[in-house]
Amino acid sequence: ACLSPHFEKVSYVSVSGNHSRIDTKERALMQERLDDLVEWYLSARMQSFENVEIGYGKRIDSSMYVVDVRGKLYVGIHGDYDPSPAHIQALQTMVGAPVYAVLIGHKHHNATDIVQGIRTIMAGSFMGMDDFCVQKRIFGKPEQMVCVCNSDGIDCFYDVALCPVE
């Protein structure tokens, strides 16, 4: 909210991930995730900000969205349903149009790659490692990825280190 005056337009989208299941992994329903509360809450709190849009883009399902950024299609996923590069082509098929980039969060660290001609941008976690990461010995520092986009796609990206929560 405090940054919105510095931008012409602020768009917020999110997908559900594997950290907010209400029941165990085996019994959880895809549509029963606490992530949905974030978008609902932000919509209510930000309704008076004319340049802030919550839920921008086209939602394929609760785990996938598509947004147009300066004429390029970006697909957002958490990543827990898409564990290998082979799934990139499946995502493009689901969208039904050429995809420029896939935005992913699942693995708790920043990374970029090009898979089957599609750029992949993986953003880290605000908190770094959680209990699951510790148990599986997956390392991740608190970090995020910022992409600067133009009509050609991603012009540059920045790794943003965050302060760990004590």
Model-derived regions, located:
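Conserved beta-sheet core of the metallophosphoesterase superfamily
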Residues: 31-63, 69-165
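Core catalytic region of metal-dependent phosphoesterases/phosphodiesterases
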Residues: 1-49
